[in-house]
């Protein structure tokens, strides 16, 4: 039984970590922290957990965290870096849901996250494992510092990874269009995340130089064995949960459909969570956010456009589960030797 502490447990990702870990047979959640709600029952902030836990929020301190074997950091970007060195040195396993240890290049934090100087712990950057089990499984086994991938980066990488691995990304940078629900803005969003502004909306934000580009390019370049650049634009849409990504890959020669199936099946055929969705019949012939919600499932798919020598790829995920807390638990399971789907066997909710 692993004792777990969640630092920053009052937000959406913290609440999802609690929901998933409370059903994990190998975990005891011994602390959940929040400065704002210190002393309050967890279910007062996360009403869906009423009747499932009597845990109260405590002040976030290193001493509280060290009562656990494993710490999940659900903190804003730029905050985890203050915690990780002390926790890592103490021998506690750390699963960081922020971006603070995702990028291997210390200078990338200046460019993509506007840090005033390069990452102060380049040695820990190299030790951190990028927590995408389908692509980093061997590295995750026994890992003590795991950087959980970003939500839109997760969908983008997983839909394009088979093409990167098998040399099918071409010389033209792939174009990725992403759509994300309002929960992606967190529990304390800005004025444009209020209901009056968000309802009926379909709007781009950070249409160029979005920070998730750094992760996407890092991981696709690793798979391709060369530098890969990506054109990425996200859009806020009128849903609460979910991310849908569409990728456009332009090639000199289009692969056969049978080869495309081989690429995707070779990478994901044994996956517990990734489903390849490309059907000729049924009501959902390609990935659809509606059919992954509440789960750690990733639906990926593709279509071929011979007129333009274009491969169109798709991915659908729940941004709070597979895009954050679910992927963190999945990586935790692989690192700690639990069944990969322990605590993650929720079937997607439909209709919703």
UniProtKB/Swiss-Prot annotation:
What CDD domains does this protein's entry cite?
A: AGPR_1_C_LysY, AGPR_1_N
This protein's GO cellular component annotations are: cytoplasm
GO molecular-function term, one example from the UniProt record: N-acetyl-gamma-glutamyl-phosphate reductase activity
**Keyword NADP set for record:** yes
Subcellular location(s) per record: Cytoplasm
User: Which reaction is catalysed here?
Assistant: [amino-group carrier protein]-C-terminal-N-(1-carboxy-5-oxopentan-1-yl)-L-glutamine + phosphate + NADP(+) = [amino-group carrier protein]-C-terminal-N-(1-carboxy-5-phosphooxy-5-oxopentan-1-yl)-L-glutamine + NADPH + H(+); [amino-group carrier protein]-C-terminal-gamma-(L-glutamyl-5-semialdehyde)-L-glutamate + phosphate + NADP(+) = [amino-group carrier protein]-C-terminal-gamma-(5-phospho-L-glutamyl)-L-glutamate + NADPH + H(+)
Q: What class of enzyme is it?
A: oxidoreductase
- Locate the coiled-coil region(s) and give their ranges: none
Q: Which UniProt keywords apply?
A: Amino-acid biosynthesis, Arginine biosynthesis, Cytoplasm, Lysine biosynthesis, NADP, Oxidoreductase
Please, which domain of life does this record's source organism belong to? Archaea
Binding residues annotated for NADP(+), in chain numbering: 10-13, 34-36, 319
Q: What is its EC number?
A: 1.2.1.103, 1.2.1.106
The record's annotation in Gene3D superfamilies points to: Dihydrodipicolinate Reductase, domain 2 (3.30.360.10), NAD(P)-binding Rossmann-like Domain (3.40.50.720)
One GO BP: lysine biosynthetic process via aminoadipic acid
Classify the main location: cytoplasm
InterPro entries named among the record's database cross-references? AGPR_type-1, LysY, NAD(P)-bd_dom_sf, NAGSA_dehydrogenase, Semialdehyde_DH_NAD-bd
Annotated catalytic residues: 151
PANTHER family from the UniProt entry: [LYSW]-L-2-AMINOADIPATE_[LYSW]-L-GLUTAMATE PHOSPHATE REDUCTASE-RELATED (PTHR32338:SF11), N-ACETYL-GAMMA-GLUTAMYL-PHOSPHATE REDUCTASE, CHLOROPLASTIC-RELATED-RELATED (PTHR32338)
- Family per similarity comment: Belongs to the NAGSA dehydrogenase family. Type 1 subfamily. LysY sub-subfamily.
Function summary = Involved in both the arginine and lysine biosynthetic pathways.
Protein name (record) = Putative [LysW]-L-2-aminoadipate/[LysW]-L-glutamate phosphate reductase
Query: What species was this sequence derived from?
Result: Pyrobaculum neutrophilum (strain DSM 2338 / JCM 9278 / NBRC 100436 / V24Sta) (Thermoproteus neutrophilus)
Q: What is the lineage of its organism?
A: Archaea, Thermoproteota, Thermoprotei, Thermoproteales, Thermoproteaceae
């Amino acid at each position: 039984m692993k004792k777990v502490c969640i630092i920053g447990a009052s937000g959406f990702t913290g609440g999802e970590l609690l929901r998933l870990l409370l059903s994990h047979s190998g975990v005891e959640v011994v602390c959940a922290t929040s400065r704002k709600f210190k002393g309050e029952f967890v279910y007062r902030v996360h009403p869906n957990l009423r009747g499932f836990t009597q845990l109260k929020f405590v002040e976030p301190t290193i001493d509280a965290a060290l009562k656990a074997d494993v710490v999940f950091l659900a903190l804003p970007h730029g905050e985890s870096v203050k915690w990780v060195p002390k926790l890592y040195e103490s021998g506690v396993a750390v699963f960081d849901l922020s971006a603070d240890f995702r990028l291997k290049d210390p200078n990338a934090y200046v460019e993509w996250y506007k840090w005033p100087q390069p990452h102060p712990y380049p040695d820990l950057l190299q030790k951190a494992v990028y927590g995408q089990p389908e692509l980093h499984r061997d590295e995750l086994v026994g890992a003590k510092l795991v950087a959980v991938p970003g939500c839109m980066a997760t969908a983008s990488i997983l839909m394009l990874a088979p093409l990167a691995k098998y040399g099918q990304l071409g010389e033209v940078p792939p174009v990725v269009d992403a759509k994300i629900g309002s929960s992606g803005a967190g529990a304390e969003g800005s004025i444009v995340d209020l209901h009056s502004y968000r309802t009926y909306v379909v709007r781009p934000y950070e249409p160029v130089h979005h920070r998730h580009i750094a992760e996407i390019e890092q991981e696709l370049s690793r798979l391709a064995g060369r530098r890969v650049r990506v054109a990425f634009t996200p859009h806020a849409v009128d849903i609460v949960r979910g991310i849908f990504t569409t990728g456009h890959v332009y090639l000199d020669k289009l692969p056969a459909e049978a080869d495309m199936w081989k690429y995707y099946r070779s990478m994901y055929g044994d996956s517990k969570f990734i489903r390849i969705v490309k059907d000729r019949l049924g009501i959902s012939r390609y990935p659809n956010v509606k059919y992954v919600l509440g789960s750690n499932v990733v639906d990926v798919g593709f279509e071929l456009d011979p007129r333009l020598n274009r491969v169109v790829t798709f991915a659908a995920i729940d941004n709070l589960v597979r895009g954050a807390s679910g992927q963190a638990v999945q990586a935790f399971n692989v690192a700690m030797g639990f069944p990969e789907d322990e605590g993650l066997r929720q079937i997607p909710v439909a209709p919703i």
